[in-house]
């Protein structure tokens, strides 16, 4: 009988192997990994472990050099089968070229594969001769590389299928952005209706790149109108994201709150690029503090402060019947004076009278609420769950289940909820009570933003002057 453990036969005759650096998908640091390409699959391994920590289907993938990452010999690998982009760094230009050629060969591998998109009628079974039956080959490999045992699948087949369908749904929804409706009164609007007709290249000077995300690049510039610094987000416009950008800009233009990054204006440049001008937050993002976790720890009163300021913004957003859907440390920006503001409305949704719940699958997996992963209808309380996960980030340096592959993490979130804090004695009973309420699996019992702002934990929050030194300390690490 074949074990569900990933068989070494999948990589024992590699077409190419070697050590490269890979950028993390959640924490954006670069780490060395051993890479192996065999046929139409790429595997990468941590240290000297015999099992891969990741498996990438190469069929139909795209690969090209990326010079915008600030590192030499970097290439970008896009795998449409799992709708993921990987940033990889080689040691030399020749090595980069040879790996890109190997990826290209894998993308054109000629054996016939099963359809990738799952159907709801799929029945997960295990056959000792063929492995998982009813699943595409790529998902079988990913299940195995996620250390999923045969018994686990047989014990909870419907739960595992739910997680697999969730991932397939994410791919489908991202490639069909028209499924996400724009604001109800603005469903016929286009980007041209929302942007300013001025030429931003004549308004914003001294532009310097300060970051890069999934959606585009971020720059800091000086406005010639008032000599103030602003942040400029540049996003390439295409058929997949045009509707989403309309929703994002419409929501940003109509969201005015002290704890939301201020929208200034937006422009279309050369008919293919959207520039969004926003308030510049000189303290960076909350993630910058968390990446210095080994040297800098947030105190309980500082965590309470960040949570309180975030909740004020969520209370306002939810009062407009909107959901942010991507609350995490990356999207919490900090002012150099200690202010805390929510940013990035790229996943935000507007609820209407007819549609008071959503079932669209978007967000970042490790921060996602169980009801969202299961594909159930959901409302504003998914943001409260994500806030609870962000509390764990601040308390422990990272979200739960980060040591597990995303697939297993999603399964654990839906079946077991969130594990307890590692050092419970370090945190007050008030902290722990607030934390547990945010992460209540029962949506009906999970409080809303208004209720949480009345919780005693909020009384512990420090003010911006006591948070400011933390921002400065993180810069110096």
From Swiss-Prot:
Consequence of changing residue 469 to A: Low basal kinase activity, loss of response to chemoattractant, reduction of cell polarity and production of multiple lateral pseudopodia
Record domain Protein kinase: where: 204-458
Disruption phenotype: Cells are less-polarized than wild-type and are unable to properly regulate the direction of pseudopod formation, resulting in a reduction in the distance traveled in response to chemoattractant.
All residue ranges annotated as the CRIB domain in the record: 112-125
Domain of life, source organism: Eukaryota
MF GO annotations: ATP binding; metal ion binding; phosphatidylinositol-3,4-bisphosphate binding; protein serine kinase activity; protein serine/threonine kinase activity; small GTPase binding
Residues annotated as the enzyme's active site: 326
GO cellular component: cytoplasm; cytosol; plasma membrane
Domain PH: 13-108
Regulation: Kinase activity is rapidly and transiently increased in response to chemoattractant stimulation.
Listed cofactors: Mg(2+)
Catalytic activity: L-seryl-[protein] + ATP = O-phospho-L-seryl-[protein] + ADP + H(+); L-threonyl-[protein] + ATP = O-phospho-L-threonyl-[protein] + ADP + H(+)
InterPro entries attached to this UniProt entry: CRIB_dom, CRIB_dom_sf, Kinase-like_dom_sf, PAK3-like, PAK_BD, PH-like_dom_sf, PH_domain, Prot_kinase_dom
Places the protein is found: Cytoplasm; Membrane
GO biological process, one term: negative regulation of pseudopodium assembly
Pfam hit, one: PH
Documented effect of changing residue 33 to C: Low basal kinase activity, loss of response to chemoattractant, reduction of cell polarity and production of multiple lateral pseudopodia
Function: Has role in the regulation of chemotaxis.
Protein name, per record: Serine/threonine-protein kinase pakC
Naturally occurring in which organism (per UniProt): Dictyostelium discoideum (Social amoeba)
